């Protein structure tokens, strides 16, 4: 089951959060859902060179809040914040409401080579430049290992190296526990448009396990148990020294 289902959808509410956070009635829900799709499509087309890995959307009353996770925030912000104003105007035009309040927060991705979307974007760019796919995958693995990820899986499918028959090849380094719900799996897909056709790219990045904090209630009047393996404290008897 863990190998078939989307890794992010399986872990929603456990290690993953929703990309859109808002509530709507049954009448307005389709409209707002289409707005989210149009906003993400507009941002990816206009700022594809900025390395945007994710777009988080939140709605509060008539206010729209966006959080952009990017590898190059300077491309979006621009000089003295001019890029933010241009992006805000473009979003208002996309949704067809120039009076909508739009707040934009740009967050820089700390570890670029540990982000699944940015790794998939790097592989896509290399394949479109006609670099051999095995060499591209090996370079992506090396970059991810330097970033300190615990596991990585890369899958590329299509007419690899211009072969007449399409096939799928994948490689894995480290652990990628897809069945473990507490495992933090970053997953992304991309397409590479080559002269021989479209290649599909899938990337799984294992960043560690998220363990919930165990809170045990102690009954009133009971003393907490001593941790196993802990050496008992030794006290010296000095009661007779002053006598």
From Swiss-Prot:
Gene Ontology biological process terms in this record: translation
Protein family according to the UniProt entry: Belongs to the universal ribosomal protein uS3 family.
Alphabetical list of InterPro entries matching this protein: KH_dom (IPR004087), KH_dom-like_a/b (IPR015946), KH_dom_type_2 (IPR004044), KH_sf_prok-type (IPR009019), Ribosomal_S3_C_sf (IPR036419), Ribosomal_uS3_bac-typ (IPR005704), Ribosomal_uS3_C (IPR001351), Ribosomal_uS3_CS (IPR018280)
Domain of life: Bacteria
Positions with biased composition (Basic and acidic residues): 233-243
Keywords: Ribonucleoprotein, Ribosomal protein, RNA-binding, rRNA-binding
Any one GO molecular-function label of the UniProt entry: mRNA binding
Protein name: Small ribosomal subunit protein uS3
Subunit structure: Part of the 30S ribosomal subunit. Forms a tight complex with proteins S10 and S14.
Its biological purpose: Binds the lower part of the 30S subunit head. Binds mRNA in the 70S ribosome, positioning it for translation.
GO cellular component: cytosolic small ribosomal subunit
PROSITE patterns: KH_TYPE_2, RIBOSOMAL_S3
Organism encoding this protein: Prochlorococcus marinus (strain MIT 9312)
Residue numbers spanned by region Disordered: 216-243
Residue ranges annotated for the KH type-2 domain, each copy included: 39-110
């Amino acid at each position: 089951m863990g190998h078939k289902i989307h890794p992010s959808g399986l872990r929603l509410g456990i290690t993953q959060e929703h990309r859109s956070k808002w509530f709507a009635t049954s009448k307005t829900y389709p409209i707002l859902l289409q707005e989210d799709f149009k906003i993400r499509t507009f941002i990816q087309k206009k700022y594809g060179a900025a390395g945007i890995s994710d777009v988080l959307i939140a709605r509060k009353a008539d206010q729209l809040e966006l959080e952009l996770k990017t590898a190059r925030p300077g491309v979006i912000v621009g000089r003295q914040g001019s890029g933010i104003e241009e992006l805000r105007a473009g979003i208002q035009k996309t949704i067809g409401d120039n009076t909508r309040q739009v707040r934009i927060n740009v967050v820089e991705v700390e570890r670029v080579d540990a982000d699944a979307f940015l790794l998939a974007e790097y592989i896509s760019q290399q394949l479109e430049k006609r670099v051999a796919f095995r060499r591209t995958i090996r370079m992506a693995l090396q970059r991810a290992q330097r970033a300190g990820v615990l596991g990585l899986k890369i899958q590329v499918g299509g007419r690899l190296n211009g072969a007449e028959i399409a096939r799928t090849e994948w490689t894995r380094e480290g652990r990628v526990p897809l069945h473990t719900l507490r495992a933090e799996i970053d997953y992304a897909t991309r397409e590479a448009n080559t002269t021989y056709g479209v290649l599909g790219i899938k990337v799984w990045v294992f960043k560690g396990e998220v363990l919930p904090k165990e809170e045990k209630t102690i009954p009133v009047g009971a003393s907490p148990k001593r941790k196993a393996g802990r050496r008992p404290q030794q006290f010296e008897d000095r009661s007779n020294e002053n006598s």
